[in-house]
């Protein structure tokens, strides 16, 4: 044999009991110009039961490790290893093989560069008959004496090659002839001659040998790169990364096993394999903080465990409830899939209305659900109700309807007993939690029903079940000594009487026995969990329980300012136990570290100056400040909710200066003592000629100290004053003379005077300022008095009240003028 031979051996110890070793040999003769075929060798201990060989090299799921073939390691203690090597023989005449690489002398041959010797018989292509192990002379002598005493005829492969013939075991009485294997050496083992023990392994091996000649695929012919030699690792060190890789592969293929909330083992296992980002993990974080996670048993099944995979795909269409109008159903499209969550888009509307839900949300339904249940479906623009059909719509949009099996079936749920459409009750206004109002049941779906406040818009509606702490039977306020808010425009609200009202409306009250008592939750302060960031719903962050009530918890995002804390229901679908993101494949935002909060920005960029440098002639725009300067912000989301990303401070939803611009989501999140803000006004999505929709919020007198607490930084300069540099340290009074001339009726009026205005006085001022009675009537319809008028922002005036931009700028700047003339409102 001439030329250099390279070998690669794939060795994987599968178990300690059998000591099975898989070896992948690839022989290449560098001197020959012809292609080499890979040879797969499987080294099997004598006590191995069954051998299963892959059909191709790609079926072997173990990493290849290059091994210097010298002294072969023993496995399972001192048990010798007997190998059966099945070479990939080719029928070609000029093709080299492993058989040709061996230096044959008689019926046996050594493998060049190693201590292994092989022989050929008529049943198996190659049998390894010995392995050389480096031993001391004393050990060699003692080993030879022990073998002679035991009668074992193992050859000593460390002898010279001239004694090869004498190394072959003689055929004597100790040799047994197996019907399946032929003449074999017993080696001191009790091997029967019937072949019962080896017939089945032999048949399997024969099939493999026969099929091995026809598995010469293109993948097997590809050359294999020689790996670098790795240092030896202990079996525990070797098996650990392999177990992790194999476990990950299995988790990706198999269905998640259903678990119960009491299964704490699931929680602990998820902490170990939790989401890691920049070296962060739940396990190390809990150890560092000396904290504990909220037990899985405290969460609802829909919050803690996902029994099904998220099978929704991009572009799938379905039906769902509008979160802003819970009584309306729209056609939705899956715009994004992240873990077990979906971002849904309203067909025919701007993406600024997109919202996130869990895949097991009860608010989404398959296509055609509205027809079966008798609900009305809000169609995209350009479609008529009498002409719409799902099949035609899917064809025209070239889309696919989400399969029905992806939706969480609630058909088995028991309908709420005692709650029927039209029945009356008393319910808490979740946007104004201090108010309890007259309400009705307007819809029943599965185990939930829709609560609607009489004579008010549907933006205040919400879905609940009989155990909700926000609903009460008729007469509850009177028993508790609390005021009851009657329906809007009720003739005599001070003398409202339930008996009279039920008789006038021809309705009945929900029976008292229909209401269920929900036990308080068991969350404790400082427990850790995972929660959706309400300012940027695409993100889930590490959170802690800051405070608790009977049915609500106050959450704090670890590492962030307490300005972002908020209240949420304990059964809200936006909170999950620790490890939920890891289990569902959703990214988890780790806590903001002190080094991050102290840094100026994630990119190390200095804060934005008030006056941007002029653009150079070589570039159309200045891209220096492309990263958001807010510490810990990754640039996702937008303060207006219309965009998925931002790159400046003005659009950051996490910036403290933008907190007043965020839409106030009071349901489930604010305390009853929170002052009512006009930002809760219902958006006008319907034409004005259809009348006012929604109800005006109720206001209470706000102490002056609360108004004094408003920082000047929350008062943003409007576009009307964009001609002057917006320096934070420049007082607004320097612009007074310039802008007072453009705002008639503003001069000489202070904020303290405006705060005492009635609704009619606000109406008259806006009419004088804008010169339009229609614009002023909007303020009158919403019952905005002077105190509420001062709390309006430009976004409230333009987006919520639907005032045109020109008049809105005048009104908002007039409010700024009022505030800056009174020290108490600055």
UniProtKB/Swiss-Prot annotation:
Region ranges (Interaction with monomethylated and dimethylated peptides): 453-460
SMART domains: MBT, SAM
Residue ranges of MBT repeats: 280-380, 388-487, 496-591
Top-rank taxon, per record: Eukaryota
Tissues and organs where the protein is expressed, per its UniProt entry: Highly expressed in brain, testis, eyes, and ES cells.
Binding locations of Zn(2+): 628, 633, 646, 652
Gene disruption: observed consequences: No visible phenotype. Mice develop and reproduc normally. Mice were followed for more than 2 years, without any alteration in normal lifespan or survival with or without sublethal irradiation.
Location of the protein in the cell: Nucleus
Subunit structure: Homodimer. Interacts with RB1/RB (when monomethylated at 'Lys-860'). Interacts with p53/TP53 (when monomethylated at 'Lys-382'). Interacts with CBX3, ETV6, KMT5A and VCP/p97.
Function as written in the Swiss-Prot or TrEMBL entry: Polycomb group (PcG) protein that specifically recognizes and binds mono- and dimethyllysine residues on target proteins, thereby acting as a 'reader' of a network of post-translational modifications. PcG proteins maintain the transcriptionally repressive state of genes: acts as a chromatin compaction factor by recognizing and binding mono- and dimethylated histone H1b/H1-4 at 'Lys-26' (H1bK26me1 and H1bK26me2) and histone H4 at 'Lys-20' (H4K20me1 and H4K20me2), leading to condense chromatin and repress transcription.
Name listed for the protein in its UniProt record: Lethal(3)malignant brain tumor-like protein 1
Lineage summary: Eukaryota, Metazoa, Chordata, Craniata, Vertebrata
């Amino acid at each position: 044999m001439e030329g250099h031979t390279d070998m690669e051996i794939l060795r994987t110890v599968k178990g300690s009991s059998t000591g099975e070793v898989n070896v992948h040999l690839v022989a290449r003769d560098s001197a020959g110009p012809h292609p080499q075929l890979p040879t797969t060798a499987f080294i099997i201990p004598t006590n191995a039961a069954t051998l299963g060989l892959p059909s191709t090299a790609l079926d072997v799921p173990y990493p290849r490790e290059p091994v210097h073939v010298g002294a072969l390691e023993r496995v399972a203690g001192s048990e010798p290893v007997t190998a059966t090597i099945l070479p990939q023989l080719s029928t070609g005449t000029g093709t080299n093989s492993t058989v040709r690489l061996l230096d044959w002398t008689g019926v046996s041959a050594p493998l060049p560069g190693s201590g292994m010797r092989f022989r050929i018989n008529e049943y198996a292509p190659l049998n390894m008959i010995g392995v050389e192990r480096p031993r001391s002379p004393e050990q060699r002598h003692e080993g030879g004496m022990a073998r002679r005493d035991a009668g074992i005829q193992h050859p000593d492969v460390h002898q010279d090659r001239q004694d090869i013939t004498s190394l072959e075991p003689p055929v004597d009485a100790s040799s047994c002839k197996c019907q399946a294997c032929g003449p074999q050496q017993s080696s001191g083992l009790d091997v029967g001659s019937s072949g019962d023990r080896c017939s089945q392994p032999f048949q399997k091996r024969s099939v493999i040998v026969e099929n091995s000649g026809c598995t010469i695929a293109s993948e097997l012919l590809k050359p294999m790169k020689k790996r670098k030699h790795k240092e030896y690792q202990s079996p525990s060190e070797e098996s650990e990364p392999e177990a992790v890789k194999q476990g990950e592969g299995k988790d990706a293929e198999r269905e998640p096993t259903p678990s119960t909330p009491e299964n704490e083992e699931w929680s602990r296992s998820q902490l170990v394999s939790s989401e890691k980002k920049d070296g962060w993990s739940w396990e190390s974080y809990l150890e560092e903080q000396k904290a504990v996670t909220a037990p899985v048993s405290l969460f609802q099944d829909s919050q803690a465990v996902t029994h099904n995979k998220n099978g929704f795909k991009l572009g799938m269409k379905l039906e769902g409830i509008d979160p802003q109008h819970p009584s309306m159903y729209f056609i939705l499209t899956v715009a994004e899939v992240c873990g077990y969550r979906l971002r849904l888009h309203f067909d025919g509307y701007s993406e600024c209305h997109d919202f996130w839900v869990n895949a097991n949300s009860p608010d989404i339904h398959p296509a055609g659900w509205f027809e079966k249940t008798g609900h009305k479906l809000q169609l995209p623009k350009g479609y008529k109700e009498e002409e719409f059909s799902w099949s035609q719509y899917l064809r025209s949009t070239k889309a696919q309807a989400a399969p029905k099996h992806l939706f969480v079936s609630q058909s088995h749920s028991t309908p709420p007993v005692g709650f029927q459409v039209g029945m009356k009750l008393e319910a808490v206004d979740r946007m104004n939690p201090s108010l309890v109002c007259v309400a009705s049941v307007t819809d029943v779906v599965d185990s939930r029903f829709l609560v609607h406040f009489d004579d008010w818009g549907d933006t205040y509606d919400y879905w609940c079940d009989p155990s909700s702490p926000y609903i009460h039977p008729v007469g509850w306020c009177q028993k508790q000594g609390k005021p009851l808010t009657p329906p809007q425009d009720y003739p005599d609200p001070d003398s409202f009487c339930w008996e009279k009202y039920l008789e006038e409306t021809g309705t009945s009250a929900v029976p008292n026995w229909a209401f269920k008592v929900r036990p308080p939750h068991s969350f404790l302060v400082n427990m850790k969990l995972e929660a959706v960031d309400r300012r940027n719903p695409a993100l889930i962050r590490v959170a802690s329980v800051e405070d608790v009530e009977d049915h609500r918890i106050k959450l704090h995002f670890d590492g962030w300012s307490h300005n972002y804390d908020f209240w949420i229901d304990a059964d809200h679908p936006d909170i999950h136990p620790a490890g939920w993101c890891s289990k569902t494949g959703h990214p988890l935002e780790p806590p903001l570290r002190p080094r991050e909060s102290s840094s100026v920005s994630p990119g190390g960029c200095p804060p934005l100056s008030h006056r941007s440098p002029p653009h150079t002639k070589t570039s159309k725009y200045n891209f220096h400040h492309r990263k958001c300067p807010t510490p810990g912000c990754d640039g996702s989301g937008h303060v207006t909710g219309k965009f998925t990303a931002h790159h400046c401070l003005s659009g950051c939803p996490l910036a403290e200066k933008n907190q007043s611009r965020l839409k106030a989501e009071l349901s489930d999140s604010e305390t009853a003592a929170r002052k009512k803000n006009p930002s809760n006004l219902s958006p006008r999505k319907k034409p004005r000629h259809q009348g006012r929709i929604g109800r005006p919020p109720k206001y209470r007198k706000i102490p002056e100290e609360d108004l004094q607490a408003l920082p000047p930084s929350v008062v943003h300069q409007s576009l009307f004053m964009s001609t002057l540099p917006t320096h934070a340290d420049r007082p607004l009074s320097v612009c007074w003379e310039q802008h007072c001339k453009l705002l008639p009726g503003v001069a000489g009026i202070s904020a303290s005077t405006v705060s005492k205005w009635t609704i009619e006085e606000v109406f008259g001022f806006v009419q004088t300022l804008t010169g339009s009675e229609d614009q002023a009537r909007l303020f009158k319809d919403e019952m905005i008095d002077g105190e509420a008028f001062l709390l309006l922002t430009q976004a409230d005036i333009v987006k919520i009240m639907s005032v045109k931009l020109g008049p809105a700028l005048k009104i908002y700047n007039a409010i700024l003028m009022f505030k800056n003339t009174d020290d108490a409102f600055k």
